[in-house]
Amino acid sequence: MASRPVTLGIDLGTTSVKAALLEAAPSLPSGFVVLASCARAARAETESAVAGPQGREQDVTRIIQALNECLDALPRQQLQRVRGIGVSGQMHGILFWKAGQGCEWMEGGPAFVFEPRAVSHLVTWQDGRCNSSFLASLPKPDSHLSVATGFGCATIFWLLKNSPEFLKSYDAAGTIQDYVVAMLCGLPRPLMSDQNAASWGYFNTQSQSWNLDTLEKAGFPIHLLPDIAEPGSMAGRTSHTWFEIPKGTQVGIALGDLQASVYSCMGQRTDAVLNISTSVQLAASMPVGFQPLQTPDPAAPVAFFPYFDRTYLGVAASLNGGNVLATFVHMLVQWMADLGLEVEESTVYSRMIQAAAQQKDTHLTITPTVLGERHLPDQLASVTRISSSDLSLGHVTRALCRGIVQNLHSMLPFQQLKEWGVARVVGSGSALSRNEVLKQEVQRAFPFPVCFGQDVDAAFGAALVMLQRDLSQKEP
């Protein structure tokens, strides 16, 4: 009996790197079984030399180190069976490298690994160097999506103005997931799906092309823009044996983490997917043939992103999710340190969730937008309806969790989901899976059945895309 196909899925997230091995299982409702998975903290944050405190950058070497640790932890005999590799990662961000010099393949024990060489830091989606006045000075995009700070093309424009010498050092650019695919396959030029291209800005999803005329007129270095390919198609094949994965293994075009996450758990077209990790996304599938209005509206809280097969997802993407809870925990730890007390962040997190679980309701209202929002960058967080009876840790934590969900509701009213034909909400994401209070607030807010999926994340989605692609190729 021929062995069933196995695919490897990788997700290069903001705070962690995940890897998952999936095997086809036609007899199961899901169609697959998870053989193994692994996650490692990236711990890649680093200072920005040119952007100062507004910058949000990550050390690519540390991200790849976390990836290597993930692969090293997976069963070697299963890695030998891998027939396809799917890669997803954090959208909007950008790193630069020298073509042909982006990495070096080295012996790492029994197999080869690659290590970054002539690469820049990754400027992430959280980067804040492009303020409102700078964004207003940029040319108008020929796209249904507007441009925000942290978007790849906006970052290039900023570097062009503030650090032009920096750009002269590199001749290739992409998201972190595009970089990994390019290194695995030894691509002479990076390839990018429309999912990631749209997240950079200045990309027209209908024509599947960059706004080259607009960008050229503005002096933009268009040679840095990757070539475009269909999500779900093949980028190339591995140029080396990699952690027991055979040389010549198919590698898919890199996907956006949003699309891969949605793909992993949208069982029906009538499902909406709520993902609460570092940030928050609420996504629903648009009808086939839907085309967004071609005029970008920076004030619109709902964006329409490319999905698969030229369809779109309607997405409310909030910058404020698990990172808000992390900020609150860090604040409490810092306050206690100022008072001469030491306590672990993990202890504070678990205690505050316990306290909120016992506090079933509160009048305290927290608008949790400590990072602003893309459509309202200057509207920061606030606390209202403060009374002396609502100041316990339980009250504040309950109000914070409720505020995260209500902020999303203000961006995409749940009545709109009904009009799109949504019948169920599937909840996923690390912040949701480990926070019972946040789950309660989600169930309270949505007028639909809510189910919380197990093992729902972008690494599984990336593997699943490759697995189903592999199976469809076998069909007559």
Swiss-Prot record:
Induction: Up-regulated by IL-4 and IL-13. Down-regulated by LPS. Changing T14M: Decreases sedoheptulose kinase activity. One of its GO terms (molecular function) is sedoheptulokinase activity. SUPFAM superfamilies: Actin-like ATPase domain. It comes from the Eukaryota. Keywords: ATP-binding, Cytoplasm, Kinase, Nucleotide-binding, Transferase. Belongs to the FGGY kinase family. This is Sedoheptulokinase. It comes from Mus musculus.
